[in-house]
Amino acid sequence: MAAAAAVGNAVPCGARPCGVRPDGQPKPGPQPRALLAAGPALIANGDELVAAVWPYRRLALLRRLTVLPFAGLLYPAWLGAAAAGCWGWGSSWVQIPEAALLVLATICLAHALTVLSGHWSVHAHCALTCTPEYDPSKATFVKVVPTPNNGSTELVALHRNEGEDGLEVLSFEFQKIKYSYDALEKKQFLPVAFPVGNAFSYYQSNRGFQEDSEIRAAEKKFGSNKAEMVVPDFSELFKERATAPFFVFQVFCVGLWCLDEYWYYSVFTLSMLVAFEASLVQQQMRNMSEIRKMGNKPHMIQVYRSRKWRPIASDEIVPGDIVSIGRSPQENLVPCDVLLLRGRCIVDEAMLTGESVPQMKEPIEDLSPDRVLDLQADSRLHVIFGGTKVVQHIPPQKATTGLKPVDSGCVAYVLRTGFNTSQGKLLRTILFGVKRVTANNLETFIFILFLLVFAIAAAAYVWIEGTKDPSRNRYKLFLECTLILTSVVPPELPIELSLAVNTSLIALAKLYMYCTEPFRIPFAGKVEVCCFDKTGTLTSDSLVVRGVAGLRDGKEVTPVSSIPVETHRALASCHSLMQLDDGTLVGDPLEKAMLTAVDWTLTKDEKVFPRSIKTQGLKIHQRFHFASALKRMSVLASYEKLGSTDLCYIAAVKGAPETLHSMFSQCPPDYHHIHTEISREGARVLALGYKELGHLTHQQAREVKREALECSLKFVGFIVVSCPLKADSKAVIREIQNASHRVVMITGDNPLTACHVAQELHFIEKAHTLILQPPSEKGRQCEWRSIDGSIVLPLARGSPKALALEYALCLTGDGLAHLQATDPQQLLRLIPHVQVFARVAPKQKEFVITSLKELGYVTLMCGDGTNDVGALKHADVGVALLANAPERVVERRRRPRDSPTLSNSGIRATSRTAKQRSGLPPSEEQPTSQRDRLSQVLRDLEDESTPIVKLGDASIAAPFTSKLSSIQCICHVIKQGRCTLVTTLQMFKILALNALILAYSQSVLYLEGVKFSDFQATLQGLLLAGCFLFISRSKPLKTLSRERPLPNIFNLYTILTVMLQFFVHFLSLVYLYREAQARSPEKQEQFVDLYKEFEPSLVNSTVYIMAMAMQMATFAINYKGPPFMESLPENKPLVWSLAVSLLAIIGLLLGSSPDFNSQFGLVDIPVEFKLVIAQVLLLDFCLALLADRVLQFFLGTPKLKVPS
């Protein structure tokens, strides 16, 4: 998946988006500044995908900066100098001195880096090979900068086509989305305008395309209805990886080692690199093939064109078509996003949202023609998304006028196709999301600069000291200085970080959690505030109807068996439930519980019949569905009068008690007291309204407005529903709080119910909870009021911190809206101190999350993926729980990716081994069991590769999706996040220490003639590689710790521990070096010959053993372990790797195998000196360990940020 973003219009020379825009753009040439400033305005403000568009014109080959300075100046200058004998050699070309070769090598290196920088950065590529063009009509390419976390910058070709009016139309395609230039009005590139914002009258009266010319124009404008990708071949993907900066840097280092005559080591390192990159490319190709299968498979569909229904392939549909949608015997998926015009559908949206509850879709034929389609508000009820499956449909009534499909399907209008659909958007997230996971780039850069200071000092020392010997080869000396400088940039870093994140992705997938944006995993380790929705997240879906209150005196709850017939009718008819062909009832769990409680039966033709009481059944005619903003739902139903065929129409309404109060013509005097008291006990309360409308004509019934039903109602009771907490909610919330996190509830439910649940779960631990009451009259102030009404306080203008120390705070949607309008600064100060946000609309949930982020808190949001989409998307870590999913898996028989998922044809996948097992004769049972075992082994191996997020696993709602409905998944995400964060931090410490030890040994010791043999370097590299591989595969502990990890790489603890540990190692190395020198024969010459063949010596053997021991000690000391990850003894592969390294060091020190020692160029060490080395190594380890642990105790445990 990592390179999936390469698909699309890449630059011809293979430039790949890796650039990070430092301050905007490359320096302009001779263009005026005013025009440059206008550049980004070529894209509309607020575009979801593209942040800026910059037009460019490609330069002729010889004018490009990758060719001109080198071919036109530097190479000719070098040849001219060579011809003129400037380098000081004779007439023979064979006698080229090293200085000339050095200059030539520097020019070639500069040339290679210049060319490669165009591959690494699109910004650099544009600066080198293109010229900015301020008239888009003259441009040939555009540089497209995406919005944050939406992929990488790309240079894409600018296409020219003829428009409908005969004028030239400029367009480009970025991440499969087409943008066209509006040259007449806006002078901007705009995404293709789909017909999604028109009045309902436009869709209701639409008759599709009447002429072939209209169809051709639409096909030209919108393209085909395909959401597929091309999988690049192996060589193309490998070339992309082989030109990546770190890979090139490693190859450069290998070249330097070859020049320094480390042949075995160089070949070993290069082979490992190539093998690792090749395996990644193979995995990438497998992943891309998987993603490719996710698109919809074309099938025939009925479309109304040229005034008649005709079958066409689903990939030929264009926006504006009228299509027939219905249940398909082949289980075909809906091919695109459509607006339902006529007929009703029940749709399984699991492939898109992950929700297991099928959704009911209503037509817009009877809605107000003047209303404008709002995709955000109307999509849940009237839009059927591409990639979903219609499980049942009710065709339009034959008696009505309008289009009727020949296949008895429902009539729908095509809104969006291809990658522009909701399914296409999810596919694009999987395809073009952030490519590689990296640490904070700025911090990494500062850290490397910090190490570079030491490397420059070491290189300067080598050069100054080395040039004191006039006979010394300056070329070799320069090579050594270059090697020292390269040693501080750890080339393993990107691989290590990728391994750490991939380990977390695999672990989460095994826990039925899927992630579409892996870069968010380290954020989970930094989370400070955890926000939860209440209904369906903290509380269970298995609801209990206690009865109906308000029918008798006080808050007494009447059992459902004793309620009057009007209340029965209101409960039986006011819902959005539907019945499937197999008799299954689908819809909201609360409504299911209510219908079950009153014991009425719903039929397929929208009729309800009582089973427990003797009264007439009801026929539901119109539903005005529940909306979060309105907080109510109403229906128009009818029943037959006794002894007559005349229909008596009724209106039934249910909703929030405070919303319905003004709609009742009569209600009990203690109305507010009743619902308030019951809500305080934690129950969910909905008011019920009813009224008889008498006789209506069919026309009147069809045209009745919502407002006509929702007035002059008779109060028929409060339905009281208990929402029990999920089994593990209490334990999980306690664990999250104990792990130093603040927990907050953000719900659309009643504030009193929310506060009760918050108290049960210990969100609230104060004696009194204050709810902010907005002013009842103009000119008055907001006031805090306790739940029982005993405390009333004015809204403090000062810091809310003092108030929060004494009371728990609850903010309602009304209070939030009032403060937003009157005192936004006070609201921002208040938000971090509030424990419960109640009666908030989805947009307000989003506002709370974005406010917390703006205040600097790393925020997690956990919700149900339908009402909470905005909040989940904006949180640093958004986790969608799937409704009606099991809370836990009892026995895990298969891996998540083996679970039945809908393939592109809609047919359920079956296990290969299951097919093999079916119907085999007894003689074949033996080989089959072996095949099964082999399949299991292969599956287990595949288990360890990064999981591909499939449609149905991922949700369009959030970056993380849990297939289980328990909030235990929050603990899993935080554990994996902390583990990844700590792994990154320890990786930096280890790489920094190894780099510093290497810089010292390559400088001071190098000048003393200490160098390692080729075999020595190879053995050291092999042992290091094993440790690096296994340290990144650490697993988190079972429980979360109170201690928080350090959120950043660059901090006082890390700097001090690296410096102190290096100081201890430095002293040990200097001491042993001097001791070894004292036991060696005295040097005769003044200057050491640095270029003679490697000769084993006591000094070399001592320093080599010491350096190896220090590097292994660095791993053991800096492995973090508890409380964030398993301890060192539990990380078996790393323990074995360190044990092998330790045995190798002991074996080399004791000289137990003389042949082995001589092979690696080690001499026999005197026994008394062996003891000295062992003691120093032990002391070095203990002191470095002590330094790290003391610093960790004082500086290594950050505290949770307390709101001020």
Curated annotation (Swiss-Prot):
Topological domain ranges for the Extracellular compartment: 88-95, 265-443, 1011, 1073-1096, 1154-1166
Region span, Disordered: 889-933
Domain of life: Eukaryota
Residue segments, region Arm-like: 886-949
Effect ascribed to mutating residue 349 to K: Found in a patient with intellectual disability; uncertain significance
Ranges where the record places region N-domain: 543-724
NCBIfam families reported in the protein's UniProt record: ATPase_P-type (TIGR01494), P-ATPase-V (TIGR01657)
Annotated protein name in UniProt: Endoplasmic reticulum transmembrane helix translocase
Biological source species: Homo sapiens (Human)
Organism phylogeny: Eukaryota, Metazoa, Chordata, Craniata, Vertebrata
Gene: ATP13A1
